[in-house]
């Protein structure tokens, strides 16, 4: 067939079809059929054609490949097979053929037709197939060609069922146009269909309408057996979650009362989601009992335990998928939202709660897998998911609280003392409540101050001499901490009663002891005034050998002033244990001085 548009009168005037052959690929030689409507829309499958024409046009007999209507021949194949088995011993047809052997082919063709007619006439008389209509209850003789999954209906009832189904499909897609729901022209914006923004186009095949605009003539199929107590109950109980649920204006209730639901066949259709407790409640020997009063709480024997005692609205799980979903909890997904509260109408995530920080789009590990706390439904969500539970310590829940990160465990913090400190040291002030607690104070990101009772030596690179600050004498005395801020440096000086072995001053010393009346100054760092109420500090004169070393250090520091003002000017904290009042010159082995300090060129390399 040529690849041009040809008229297709089977679909009506203006319809055209075209057959295109494939010229390459694994399916080379096969053809594809396309149809074009009078409005210019192109259709390439029978499914699209059915959606386009709607339920008014029946395409059961339409051959999409050829573009014609194919009327099936009468099917009598099963009856003919039965007649052959029945006519084997007598074989009257073959004797007739032998008698009329040398005749024309027309007579040979007429013989099987006469045989089949005789078989169809004798089959109902010899093997009647009576049946009972499931709808009206009358008995009729069936032909035995129907499939087992279809209901046994007489011809009149089957025709009524087909017409009813066709009408219901039209009501679901288009509507009747007469009821109050069909007269509504605007969506409510609160139902699940409006919130999910599902397509309303009929050609899409979804036909998702707003719940307020759904035709009232749509009849939902009753999935009950009609025999059990739930199917025979005609009135609502008034105390189940469905009956207690507040109605939404303009919307009708789509779920049955729990007491009116069928008790048979519900769990047999489920593929999973059944645990041992529910299996024990559905034992065949258990008989349904009337619901006990609210004061008593025995274990229910019915398969619907939630029907006996109503649950509060906050703990009620709202389902908007199917009628069967309002059963005891299974492992299937549920949707807990009303669609009308402020949380359900919120579109954006806060980005600061723990659920948002867990999402991959905010850099989380996707472990909790919950939506934003500020978008949890205020009516149907579980209480543990609401933001009020998460931010109880906050003053108010008006805005999303900041995200609190978990602190690292103390075992993972292993700090080692190095030869130099980082440029910035963040020290924590000691609280007076924890005087007896043990204790290592953190200094910056990777250093630890020693516990009380030990001596500290602060070395200033390039300075004239170090300053030694021993710990307090008694554990009960509280050390007053005072910050001394330098350029890019913050360190701690303890100011209890101190014995200083050596001070960096250029004055001449006299033998004996001297009492300082001015605060101790460290070169290169501004110091704060010392409390005048503190006790006096004893000092001893330096040795001449140490003065020579100090002069060398001063000359080395003058060669590189820029380096001393930068990162090289950071102090070195070294722990000296159990000095016990020893002179500082005797402990020179504890403080080895690096050669890099004396040679500024080595540091630059």
Swiss-Prot record:
Zn(2+) 6 binds at residues 350, 353, 356, 372. Interacts with OASL, ATF7IP, ATF7IP2 and BAHD1. Binds CHAF1A and the SUV39H1-CBX5 complex via the MBD domain. Binds MGP via the TRD domain. May be part of the MeCP1 complex. Widely expressed. The gene is MBD1. There is a cross-link at residues 117, 277, 422, 440, 499, 538, 558 (Glycyl lysine isopeptide (Lys-Gly) (interchain with G-Cter in SUMO2)). It comes from the Eukaryota. Residues 106-120 have a biased composition (Basic and acidic residues). PANTHER family: METHYL-CPG BINDING PROTEIN, MBD, METHYL-CPG-BINDING DOMAIN PROTEIN 1. This is Methyl-CpG-binding domain protein 1. It comes from Homo sapiens. Residues 529-592 are annotated as: Transcriptional repression domain (TRD). The keyword Nucleus applies. Zn(2+) 4 binds at residues 237, 240, 243, 257. Residues 83-99, 403-417 have a biased composition (Basic residues). A motif (Nuclear localization signal) lies at residues 84-88. The methyl-CpG-binding domain (MBD) functions both in binding to methylated DNA and in protein interactions. GO terms for cellular component: chromosome; intracellular membrane-bounded organelle; nuclear matrix; nuclear speck; nucleoplasm; nucleus. Residues 426-439 have a biased composition (Polar residues). The modification Phosphoserine is found at residues 297, 391, 399.
């Amino acid at each position: 067939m040529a690849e041009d548009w040809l008229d297709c009168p089977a679909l009506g005037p203006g319809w055209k079809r075209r057959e295109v052959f494939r010229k390459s690929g694994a399916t080379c030689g096969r053809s594809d059929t396309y149809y074009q409507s009078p409005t210019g829309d192109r259709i390439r499958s029978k499914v699209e054609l059915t959606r386009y024409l709607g339920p008014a046009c029946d395409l059961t007999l339409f051959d999409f490949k050829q573009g014609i209507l194919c009327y099936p021949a009468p099917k009598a194949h099963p009856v003919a097979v039965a007649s052959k088995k029945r006519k084997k011993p007598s074989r009257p047809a073959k004797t007739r053929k032998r008698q009329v052997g040398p005749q024309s082919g027309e007579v040979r063709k007429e013989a099987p037709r006469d045989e089949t007619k005789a078989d169809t006439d004798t089959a109902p008389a010899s093997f009647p197939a009576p049946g009972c209509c499931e709808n009206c209850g009358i008995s009729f003789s069936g032909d035995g060609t129907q499939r087992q999954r279809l209901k046994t209906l007489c011809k009149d009832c089957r025709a009524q069922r087909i017409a009813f189904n066709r009408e219901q499909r039209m009501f679901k897609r288009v509507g009747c146009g007469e009821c109050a729901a069909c007269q509504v022209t605007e969506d409510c914006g609160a139902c699940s269909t409006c919130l999910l923004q599902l397509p309303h186009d009929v050609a899409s095949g979804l036909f998702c309408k707003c719940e307020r605009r759904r035709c009232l003539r749509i009849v939902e199929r009753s999935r009950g057996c009609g025999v059990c107590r739930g199917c025979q109950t005609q009135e609502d109980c008034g105390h189940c979650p469905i009956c207690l649920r507040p109605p939404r204006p303009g919307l009708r209730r789509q779920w049955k009362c729990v007491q009116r639901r069928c008790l048979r066949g519900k769990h047999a259709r489920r593929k999973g989601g059944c645990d041992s407790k529910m299996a024990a409640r559905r034992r065949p020997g258990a008989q349904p009992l009337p619901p006990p009063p609210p004061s008593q709480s025995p274990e229910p024997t019915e398969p619907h335990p939630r029907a006996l005692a109503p649950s509060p609205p906050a703990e009620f799980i709202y389902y908007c998928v199917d009628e069967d979903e309002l059963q005891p909890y299974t492992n299937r997904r549920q949707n807990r939202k009303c669609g009308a509260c402020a949380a359900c109408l919120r579109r954006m995530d806060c980005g600061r709660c723990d659920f948002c920080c867990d999402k991959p789009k905010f850099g989380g590990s996707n472990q909790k897998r919950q939506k934003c706390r500020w978008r949890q439904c205020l009516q149907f969500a579980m209480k543990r998911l609401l933001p009020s539970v998460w931010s109880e310590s906050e003053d108010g829940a008006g805005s999303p609280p900041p995200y609190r990160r978990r602190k690292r465990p103390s075992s993972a913090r292993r700090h080692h003392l190095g030869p130099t400190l980082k440029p910035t040291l963040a020290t924590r002030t000691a609280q007076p409540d924890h005087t007896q607690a043990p204790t290592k104070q953190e200094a910056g990101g990777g250093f630890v101050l020693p516990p009380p009772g030990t001596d500290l030596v602060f070395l200033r690179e390039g300075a004239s001499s170090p300053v030694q600050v021993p710990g307090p004498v008694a554990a009960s005395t509280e050390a007053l901490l005072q910050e001394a801020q330098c350029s890019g440096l913050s360190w701690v000086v303890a100011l209890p009663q101190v014995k200083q072995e050596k001070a960096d001053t250029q004055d001449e010393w006299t033998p004996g002891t001297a009492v300082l009346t001015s605060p101790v100054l460290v070169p290169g760092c501004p110091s704060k005034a010392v409390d005048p109420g503190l006790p006096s500090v004893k000092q001893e004169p330096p040795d001449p050998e140490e003065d020579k070393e100090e002069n060398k250090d001063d000359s080395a520091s003058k060669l590189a002033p820029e380096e001393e003002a930068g990162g090289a000017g950071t102090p070195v904290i070294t722990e000296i244990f159990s000095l016990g009042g020893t002179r500082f010159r005797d402990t020179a082995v504890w403080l080895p001085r690096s050669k890099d300090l004396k040679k500024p060129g080595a540091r630059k390399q």
